[in-house]
């Protein structure tokens, strides 16, 4: 074969099977560069096959529910139960039956760049998205578990059309007679995973803005969780207006600074 490596690379990018005549022809080319291209092409196909299989697996609950006649299946998830500061945020997402974007998974398993890309895709393709944001004051009043349920219900109530079936990550919500709570649902249901991405990106962006308002706690990086820098901030600065006073390290910092007055 007399074609350059660059030309072969471009042609292989259009090939989808080892049975393709051009791929077969390349296998006879002994140049190391060509053999490396064949190897990388096979790896690309393997990755694509895994993503396609993962998509089918992630849609199995939705596929079954669509077959049962449900039309508007909402996935619900939350983020921010554990942080010492900021709100708890829930999202509810209704995806179309033909939604086929690969790479949707539990937001915690995706890097920030990937989450941001998928956030935009989900916003563009979803039938409806609802978001519930419950701030630190309510969390302190009712506890984080109840605040999370309020956030989820708020997100669901924002959906239009209203869902006729609800898939929830872990927490039984009793929002509808037609609902299913799934342990680690954000790794099992594409609707819940999509909701986890919407909730995560929404809250992260809020915390990045809070970092500008309340510097010294590293909110832009820890998102309000009790990291070393955050705890150091509590020790040296004290609490800020978005801290959860019912959470132990915050409560201790507040008492400490009050004792110094």
UniProtKB/Swiss-Prot annotation:
Domain RNase H type-2: 71-259
Catalytic function, reaction form: Endonucleolytic cleavage to 5'-phosphomonoester
Example GO molecular function: RNA binding
UniProt binding sites for a divalent metal cation: 77-78, 169
Enzyme Commission code: 3.1.26.4
Textual note on the cofactor: Manganese or magnesium. Binds 1 divalent metal ion per monomer in the absence of substrate. May bind a second metal ion after substrate binding.
Localisation per UniProt entry: Cytoplasm
Principal location: cytoplasm
The keyword Manganese is annotated on this UniProt entry: yes
GO cellular component term, pick one: ribonuclease H2 complex
Signal peptide from the UniProt entry: none
Cofactor: Mn(2+); Mg(2+)
Keywords: Cytoplasm, Endonuclease, Hydrolase, Manganese, Metal-binding, Nuclease
Biological process annotations from GO: DNA replication, removal of RNA primer; mismatch repair
Disulphide connectivity of cysteines: none
Family named by the database record: Belongs to the RNase HII family.
Protein name: Ribonuclease HII
Organism: Listeria innocua serovar 6a (strain ATCC BAA-680 / CLIP 11262)
Biological classification of the source: Bacteria, Bacillati, Bacillota, Bacilli, Bacillales
């Amino acid at each position: 074969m007399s074609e350059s490596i660059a030309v072969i690379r471009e042609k292989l990018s259009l090939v989808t099977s080892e049975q393709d005549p051009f791929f077969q022809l390349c296998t006879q080319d002994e140049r190391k560069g060509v053999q490396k291209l064949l190897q990388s092409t096979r790896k690309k196909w393997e990755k694509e096959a895994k993503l396609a299989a993962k998509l089918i697996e992630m849609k199995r609950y939705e596929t079954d529910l669509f077959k049962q006649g449900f039309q508007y299946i909402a996935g619900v998830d939350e983020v921010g139960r554990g942080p010492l500061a900021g709100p708890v945020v829930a999202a509810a997402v209704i995806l179309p039956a033909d939604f086929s974007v690969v790479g949707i998974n539990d937001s915690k398993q995706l890097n920030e760049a990937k989450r941001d890309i998928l956030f935009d895709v989900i916003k563009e393709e979803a039938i409806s998205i609802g978001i519930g944001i419950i701030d630190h004051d309510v969390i302190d009043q009712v506890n984080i578990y109840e605040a999370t349920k309020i956030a989820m219900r708020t997100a669901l109530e924002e959906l239009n059309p209203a869902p006729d079936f609800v898939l929830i990550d872990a927490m039984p919500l009793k929002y509808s007679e037609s609902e299913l709570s799934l342990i680690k649902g954000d790794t099992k249901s594409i609707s819940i995973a999509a909701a986890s991405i919407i909730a995560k990106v929404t809250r992260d962006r809020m915390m990045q803005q809070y970092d500008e308002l309340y510097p010294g706690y590293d909110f832009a990086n820890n998102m309000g969780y009790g990291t070393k820098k955050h705890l150091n901030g509590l020790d040296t600065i004290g609490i800020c207006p978005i801290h959860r006073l019912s959470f132990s390290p915050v409560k201790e910092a507040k008492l400490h600074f009050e004792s110094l007055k």
